[in-house]
Amino acid sequence: MSLLTEVETYVLSIIPSGPLKAEIAQRLEDVFAGKNTDLEVLMEWLKTRPILSPLTKGVLGFVFTLTVPSERGLQRRRFVQNALNGNGDPNNMDKAVKLYRKLKREITFYGAKEVALSYSTGALASCMGLIYDRMGTVTTEVAFGLVCATCEQIADSQHRSHRQMVATTNPLIRHENRMVMASTTAKAMEQMAGSSEQAAEAMEVASQARQMVQAMRTIGTHPSSSAGLKDDLLENLQAYQKRMGVQMQRFK
């Protein structure tokens, strides 16, 4: 796996699924392929994206700045600086300075990532902030190691939170999660339908599922009534894909 592929993998792991994630993936691919060369436009686009947390925007802004060539005097962006200040905690800043000194001695991506993983997310963000504000310089490879360590820590905490929700025994949360997943699956079916001959059928199934979820939410139903809803939808989707000659086992 190439270095840039690895960076793209880690960065995308902290972005919530949805159309925006697909859009960001495309921007990252373009940036890494040298196709998107206007850093100002790219940063303005990033600043106005909805849903993303300030820290996620900070990480993406840092990656774009590292990768896209820019004029030396180009102004640093406030939204990135604010996201990478370690919540203004002096303790984070102290640790960031110590980490920076260690990173200066590293020359490889993996070495930098290994060193960075022993620090907290706040300290890692502060260290990125130091480098972003030109208070310190490291090689691009080492900076990418720092980025990936930060993403790994964020993804770990997101995974723990997700696992807690999936494992919850609260029937109301499980019920709502099944309905949200059914709606998301229906939306994916509509997007995949495109203009094929079978599109009408897929759209019909998706539309019925959306209406069912809407009705269940409006009138209120027993928490067990949504069981199997997403699975039924996925079966319909896979049957549709087979007829289309498409195999997408990974969809689940």
Curated annotation (Swiss-Prot):
It comes from the Viruses. GO terms for biological process: viral budding from plasma membrane. GO terms for cellular component: host cell nucleus; membrane; virion membrane. InterPro entries: Flu_matrix_M1 (IPR036039), Flu_matrix_M1_C (IPR013188), Flu_matrix_M1_N (IPR001561), Flu_matrix_M1_N_sub1 (IPR015423), Flu_matrix_M1_N_sub2 (IPR015799), INFV_M1 (IPR037533). The keyword 4Fe-4S does not apply. It is found in: Virion membrane; Host nucleus. Residues 1-164 are annotated as: Membrane-binding. Pfam families: Flu_M1 (PF00598), Flu_M1_C (PF08289). SUPFAM superfamilies: Influenza virus matrix protein M1 (SSF48145). Keywords: Host nucleus, Membrane, RNA-binding, Viral matrix protein, Virion. Residues 165-252 are annotated as: RNP-binding. One of its GO terms (molecular function) is RNA binding. It is a peripheral membrane protein. A motif (Nuclear localization signal) lies at residues 101-105. The keyword Methyltransferase does not apply. Plays critical roles in virus replication, from virus entry and uncoating to assembly and budding of the virus particle. M1 binding to ribonucleocapsids (RNPs) in nucleus seems to inhibit viral transcription. Interaction of viral NEP with M1-RNP is thought to promote nuclear export of the complex, which is targeted to the virion assembly site at the apical plasma membrane in polarized epithelial cells. Interactions with NA and HA may bring M1, a non-raft-associated protein, into lipid rafts. Forms a continuous shell on the inner side of the lipid bilayer in virion, where it binds the RNP. Belongs to the influenza viruses Matrix protein M1 family. Most abundant protein in virion. When expressed alone can form virus-like particles in transfected cells. Homodimer and homomultimer. Interacts with NEP. Binds ribonucleocapsid by both interacting with genomic RNA and NP protein. May interact with HA and NA. Cannot bind NP without genomic RNA. This is Matrix protein 1. It comes from Influenza A virus (strain A/Fowl plague virus/Rostock/8/1934 H7N1). The gene is M.
